[in-house]
From Swiss-Prot:
<feature type="transmembrane region" description="Helical">
    <location>
        <begin position="170"/>
        <end position="190"/>
    </location>
</feature>
<keyword id="KW-0406">Ion transport</keyword>
<feature type="transmembrane region" description="Helical">
    <location>
        <begin position="329"/>
        <end position="349"/>
    </location>
</feature>
<feature type="transmembrane region" description="Helical">
    <location>
        <begin position="63"/>
        <end position="83"/>
    </location>
</feature>
<dbReference type="Pfam" id="PF03814">
    <property type="entry name" value="KdpA"/>
</dbReference>
<dbReference type="GO" id="GO:0005886">
    <property type="term" value="C:plasma membrane"/>
</dbReference>
<feature type="transmembrane region" description="Helical">
    <location>
        <begin position="484"/>
        <end position="504"/>
    </location>
</feature>
<keyword id="KW-0630">Potassium</keyword>
<dbReference type="InterPro" id="IPR004623">
    <property type="entry name" value="KdpA"/>
</dbReference>
<feature type="transmembrane region" description="Helical">
    <location>
        <begin position="132"/>
        <end position="152"/>
    </location>
</feature>
<keyword id="KW-0812">Transmembrane</keyword>
<keyword id="KW-0997">Cell inner membrane</keyword>
<feature type="transmembrane region" description="Helical">
    <location>
        <begin position="5"/>
        <end position="25"/>
    </location>
</feature>
<keyword id="KW-0813">Transport</keyword>
<keyword id="KW-0472">Membrane</keyword>
<feature type="transmembrane region" description="Helical">
    <location>
        <begin position="253"/>
        <end position="273"/>
    </location>
</feature>
<protein>
    <recommendedName>
        <fullName>Potassium-transporting ATPase potassium-binding subunit</fullName>
    </recommendedName>
</protein>
Length: 557
């Protein structure tokens, strides 16, 4: 079992790096404002039709464009969900959503969280799934990538005030990165057996002679961008454990690769644009070390079996509760870490049924900000915040003004960095406390004791960090939970983007200083260790007390 797990991890990472390297080169061209070959004419026509000037923006203008697009998308999606019974492509005549569920769902998909307090096949029409959720899957992913484009330019430009044009970046990211790759993945999913149709639900006779209603729909097209954009919201309630979404072991492997390929490619792109590929490799080493350790811990915990079943005398040599027999324990463990290290949240197993330690690792990966590869764009700009913090700590230790890529990190940048890092922990801890203090919060818990608290802590951690996965024992479709989680998702997304863009605006105006004998190298194993230590230290200091009340207490009980 150990050899199989090791081979699975190594194979996954090797294939990932092979795919991400050329994609990173293409992203580097876009960051450097170099059109991809053969796209100039199409872009010129589109820019003219859409009225995009192409003039570069300062950080406030860039941020305003990103926020404006997302707020417009939020309003459109909210009213679309409220009135879906008036809209076409609704063969099951599904009614509109309640105001609180519509608000929660709209915020969820606009913020790239894709938390779902509903069952897709019984709640949403084909039109809502396609024109509403799938569109936001593209736009939210493009928004995250555009923000990291701006931040990378801030590190590599000197004495400037502009960070690029947000509309140009969003169009290029959507047209030349997300759309073509998602199309290829969708076609592959269809070939493997995923659904893609507009048929009414089909009534079939099972082998036992009973009648069953099989849901239909345009699944493959949504599934592709759901994984590629690290969105995670499933067409069906069972998400990627449903055979209509994820029909084979091969599609499952491709889904895991799709989650990580853009975050990995962005690290390569960062190294290329910075003119020092070692900087990108340093980030990948730090992410990979944490990732491999976390996968190993989850695999170890799940192959030990469920101690509660063992205590009852049941056969539990491995913990198969809540897992697809098609995939097994090792693949389910790898998928769980992939989906929570990134801001994806898609699942092929029920995280609520993992062992105490097996469920704690995905929860902790979200709580540290999903900086281990992370979401498209958001993972890298989250890790860059920890890079700045690590540089600052190192500067204090050696008595020098901290600098990164030749740019001095001053008080303003550190205040903004601290603010951005503290946004999500504050939301998680205060949100969990509020839920536990109120009857409306506690009544949603399926389980009592430490595991019930873990369900609450996981839900708020998932929402605040824009992941979207859940310990499904929590009955979250209530006005209290829909509003609480919507607030956490909204502030967790834009409360980080705003200070990140402010940091970019500050850094882009600075000159790069040449390296000297006293400059801290930020590309070697020493800095990789310092960066990992910073991530672990912040995560440990912030969340160990809360984790001790949940999964740790459950493990020890």
């Amino acid at each position: 079992m150990a050899a199989q797990g090791f081979l699975l991890i190594v194979t996954f990472l090797l294939v990932l790096m092979v795919l991400a390297r050329p994609l990173g080169s293409g992203l580097a061209r876009l960051i450097n404002d170099i059109p991809l070959p053969g796209t100039t004419g199409v872009e010129r026509v589109l820019f003219r039709v859409l009225g995009v000037s192409g003039l570069e923006m300062n950080w406030k203008q860039y941020l305003s464009a990103i926020l404006g697009l997302n707020m417009l998308g939020l309003a459109v999606l909210f009213f679309m969900l409220l009135g879906q019974h008036y809209l076409p492509l609704n063969p099951q005549q599904l009614p509109g959503l309640s105001w609180d569920l519509a608000l929660n769902t709209a915020v969820s998909f606009v913020t790239n969280t894709n938390w779902q307090s509903y069952s897709g096949e019984t709640t949403l029409s084909y039109f809502s799934q396609m024109a509403g959720l799938t569109v936001q899957n593209f736009l939210s992913a493009a928004s995250g990538i555009a923000v990291i484009f701006a931040l990378i330019r801030a590190f590599t430009r000197q004495s400037m005030s502009t960070l690029g044009n947000a509309w140009v970046d969003l169009l290029r990211i959507t047209l030349w990165v997300l759309a073509p790759v998602a199309l290829l993945i969708a076609l592959f999913f269809i070939q493997q057996g995923a659904l893609q149709n507009f048929l009414p639900y089909q009534s079939v006779t099972t082998v036992e002679g009973a009648q069953q209603l099989l849901p239909m729909g345009p699944v493959a097209s949504q599934e592709a961008i759901k994984m590629l954009g690290t969105n995670g919201g499933g067409f069906f309630n069972a998400n990627s454990s449903h055979p209509f979404e994820n029909p084979t072991a091969l599609t499952n492997f491709v889904q895991m690769l799709a989650i990580f390929v853009i975050p990995t490619a962005l690290c390569f792109a960062f190294g290329e644009v910075a003119g020092e590929r070692r900087q990108g490799r340093m980030l990948l080493w730090a992410m990979s070390v944490i990732f491999v350790i976390c996968v190993g811990v989850v695999m170890w915990a799940e192959v030990q079996g469920n101690p509660h079943l063992l205590a009852l005398g049941a056969d539990s040599s491995i913990n198969m509760e809540g897992k697809e027999s098609r995939f097994g324990v090792l693949v389910s463990s790898l998928f769980a870490v992939v989906t929570t290290a990134a801001s994806c949240g898609a699942v092929i197993a029920m995280h609520d049924s993992f062992t105490a330690l097996g469920g704690m690792v995905p929860m902790w990966l979200m709580q540290i900000g999903e900086v281990v590869f992370g979401g498209v764009g958001s993972g890298l700009y989250g890790m860059m915040l920890f890079v700045l913090l690590a540089v600052f700590i190192a500067g204090l230790m050696i008595g020098r003004t901290p600098e990164y890529l030749g740019k001095k990190i001053d008080v303003r940048e550190m205040k903004l960095t601290a603010l951005a890092i503290l946004v999500t922990p504050t939301l998680v801890l205060m949100g969990a406390a509020l839920a536990m203090m109120t009857d409306a919060g506690r009544s949603a818990m399926l389980n009592p004791g430490p595991h019930g608290f873990s369900e609450v802590l996981y839900a708020v951690s998932s929402a605040a960090n824009n992941n979207g996965s859940a310990f499904a024992g929590l009955s979250a479709n209530s006005p209290f939970w829909n509003c609480l989680l919507a607030f956490c998702m909204f502030v967790g997304r834009f409360g980080v983007i705003i200070p990140v863009m402010a940091i970019a605006g500050s850094l882009v105006s600075k000159k790069s200083q040449p390296a000297s004998s006293g400059t801290l190298p930020t590309h070697g194993p020493l800095f990789v260790g310092l960066l990992i230590g910073t991530v672990l230290l912040v995560g440990a200091l912030t969340f160990i007390p809360a984790l001790a009340l949940g999964p740790v207490a459950e493990y020890l009980s």
